[in-house]
A protein has these predicted regions:
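N-terminal hydrophobic/helix-forming segments and targeting peptides
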Residues: 1-351
């Protein structure tokens, strides 16, 4: 979707570029379908640095494991593993949708999206009814729903013999689920091994409040910043310094892996941009990165008067009062923090 949108605005895939890039050119590169970097070439040499906006496009969710489908007491489930920091108790008894891809051994990619259309089925993670939850209610919030209890209820109707049930098949409900997946997605059970399926709350974003002053939606961390960063990039024109917007994966689990910021996707892509200008050198790449200025765009917590004890009010952000700039993050003694220097903050505020 992002690629289609930016191509309408004149962006071209960097790998398709023939000839030398010049000021005003717009290019992009995609990493494994999960991260994207966009560049608008400025009038100044790239080695003088770029203005970079960065955001992440993954959100906390529940992932389906690689051998997930099982039956227990005539109920079919998908075995799961939660992704990122979640409050597990928030994910039970909600309508849930299944998104992702199935990649078959022949390389065929089948997209999966079940639970978002009005006539789609939805899924659920079950919970105890209040009448049986006496002991459960005594537990801490962190333990009231355990990670192993987040398996997704996906079916309960058994496959009948006249519908093709094998006489030796003991798990008729599981067999029926697989029949449906085969009919709709041409999927075999072993295809789960090379699938990436994600469980998220079902439903569209909605206006919140009688005055419609707020937006209620899944995934605002950090897609609200990714969306605005993308459109800021599309709106900018005639830049002096090269502009860059990078939207990446895997932030919620530490920015690891080939599509997270710990990989060298940005550095490699900048190297390709310099090379496409016909003047590549390692020194120019290092100078381009050293002289660049970046805003890491992520969400912040707005002051909530119902939970005032969780905030330091004098330094807190307040809802609906404009942009939030964090000089530093981290915990306790600024552990794991990136502490921006005062000169850079002053430059940002002047802008």
């Amino acid at each position: 979707l992002t690629v289609k949108e930016i191509e309408k605005k004149g962006y071209r895939n960097l790998k398709d570029i023939k000839g030398s890039l010049k000021a005003g050119d717009k290019v992009y590169a995609v990493c494994m379908g999960k991260s994207i970097a966009m560049f608008q070439i400025g009038k100044e040499p790239l080695e003088k640095g770029m203005n970079i906006l960065g955001a992440h496009i993954d959100s906390p969710r529940i992932d389906v494991k690689q051998n997930p489908l099982y039956e227990n007491e005539n109920l079919a489930y998908l075995d799961t593993h939660y992704y990122g920091g979640i409050k597990k108790y928030q994910w039970v008894t909600l309508p849930l949708a299944l998104h992702g891809v199935i990649v078959k051994t022949d390389g065929t990619v089948q997209k999966v999206n079940i639970g978002e259309k009005e006539d789609d089925p939805v899924f659920v993670v079950t919970d105890l009814l209040i009448h049986l939850a006496g002991k459960q209610m005594e537990k801490k919030a962190s333990a009231v729903i355990e990670g192993e209890k987040l398996d997704l209820l996906i079916g309960s109707r058994p496959l009948e013999k006249e519908e093709g049930l094998d006489e030796d098949e003991k798990d008729a409900v599981k067999a029926n689920v697989m029949k449906i997946l085969t009919d709709y997605y041409n999927m075999e059970e072993e295809d789960f091994l090379s699938a990436e399926l994600e469980i998220v709350p079902a439903g569209k974003a909605r206006d919140c409040g009688l005055d419609r002053s707020m937006i209620l939606a899944y995934g605002q961390d950090d897609r609200v910043c990714a969306f605005t960063s993308l459109f800021a990039m599309l709106d900018v024109e005639d830049v002096e310094r090269t502009s860059c917007c990078i939207l990446v994966d895997k932030e919620e689990i530490g920015s690891v892996g080939a599509t997270g910021m710990h990989a060298h996707f940005l550095e490699n892509t900048v190297a390709e941009v310099i090379n496409s200008q016909g003047e590549y050198s390692e020194l120019k790449l290092r100078r381009a990165l050293k002289n660049s200025k970046m805003l890491s765009a992520d969400v912040n917590a707005g002051y909530d008067p119902l939970y005032a004890e969780a905030f330091e009010k004098r330094s807190a952000a307040f809802f609906g009062r404009g942009l939030v700039f964090n000089k530093f993050t981290g915990a306790r003694g600024k552990s794991g923090s990136n502490d921006a220097n005062a000169e850079y903050l002053a430059e940002v505020f002047r802008a």
